[in-house]
């Protein structure tokens, strides 16, 4: 009889390549790096600032805008070129932020509208008033100093009030002197009317005496003739 064949151990199951990949994925996951902050303002703001500072009558071209961005903000214009063109083609012109004076699309020239210029000019005085506010706050301090000086003035006023009665007494003395001077010339005028009065009284006395003596002398002979007529 032949010996029985030895039993063969079952082979271990081989892991599939798909499962191996799934196990490796958690190991490959790494925390994402935070995005670096921008070193320049938005593209729209940079383009508007470029057109504003260039102040070209016919408008600023795409090349002129790029040169300004490189000089002013030191950015990579090649990376920002698609964003600049996109802003110039659609957003800026459609929204009314820019006016296209020449060409079509991003290849033309662009200019700021008149309304945008007026708004920017109106905003400048607001900044000026904001800067002046701290100066206005400093003024009350000067007013406080003036109040102190005003408080000191009444002391000087009291001193002057004491001196005023002295001035009044001097004025009274000065007023008494002209009164005495006016009283002195009065006795000089008194003898003049005395000389005039006796002249007027002497004239009527001479005229009245002769008239009264002549009239009764003429009437006496008429009264003696009447008794002679009765005797006849």
UniProtKB/Swiss-Prot annotation:
Matching SMART domains: H15
Cysteine-cysteine disulfides: none
One GO BP: nucleosome assembly
Keyword Nucleotide-binding set for record: no
Skewed-composition ranges (Basic residues): 149-171, 179-232
Compartment annotation: Nucleus; Chromosome
Start and end residues of each stretch annotated as Disordered: 1-44, 103-232
Pfam families (alphabetical): Linker_histone (PF00538)
Gene3D superfamilies linked to this entry: Winged helix-like DNA-binding domain superfamily/Winged helix DNA-binding domain
Segments of skewed composition (Low complexity): 1-18
CDD domains for the chain: H15
Molecular functions per Gene Ontology: DNA binding; structural constituent of chromatin
PROSITE patterns found in the cross-reference section: H15
Domain spans labelled H15: 39-114
Record InterPro entries: H1/H5, Histone_H1/H5_H15, WH-like_DNA-bd_sf, WH_DNA-bd_sf
UniProt function note: Histones H1 are necessary for the condensation of nucleosome chains into higher-order structures.
Family, similarity comment: Belongs to the histone H1/H5 family.
Protein name: Histone H1-II
Lineage: Eukaryota, Metazoa, Ecdysozoa, Arthropoda, Hexapoda
């Amino acid at each position: 009889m032949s010996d029985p064949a030895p039993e063969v151990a079952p082979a271990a199951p081989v892991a599939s390549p798909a499962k191996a990949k799934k196990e490796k994925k958690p190991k490959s996951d790494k925390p994402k790096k935070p995005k670096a902050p921008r070193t320049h303002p938005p593209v729209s703001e940079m383009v508007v600032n470029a057109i504003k500072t260039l102040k070209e009558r016919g408008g600023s071209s795409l090349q002129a805008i790029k040169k300004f961005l490189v000089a002013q903000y030191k950015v990579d214009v090649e990376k920002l070129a698609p964003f600049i063109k996109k802003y110039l083609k659609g957003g800026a012109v459609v929204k009314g932020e820019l006016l296209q004076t020449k060409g079509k699309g991003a290849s033309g020239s662009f200019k700021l509208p008149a309304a945008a210029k007026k708004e920017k000019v109106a905003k400048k005085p607001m900044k000026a008033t904001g800067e002046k506010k701290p100066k206005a706050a400093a003024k009350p301090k000067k007013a406080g100093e003036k109040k102190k000086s005003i408080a000191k003035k009444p002391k000087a006023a009291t001193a002057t009030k004491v001196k005023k009665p002295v001035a009044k007494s001097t004025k009274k003395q000065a007023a008494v002197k002209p009164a005495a001077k006016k009283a002195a010339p009065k006795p000089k005028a008194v003898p003049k009317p005395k000389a005039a009065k006796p002249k007027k009284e002497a004239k009527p006395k001479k005229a009245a005496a002769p008239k009264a003596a002549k009239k009764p002398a003429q009437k006496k002979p008429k009264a003696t003739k009447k008794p002679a007529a009765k005797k006849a």
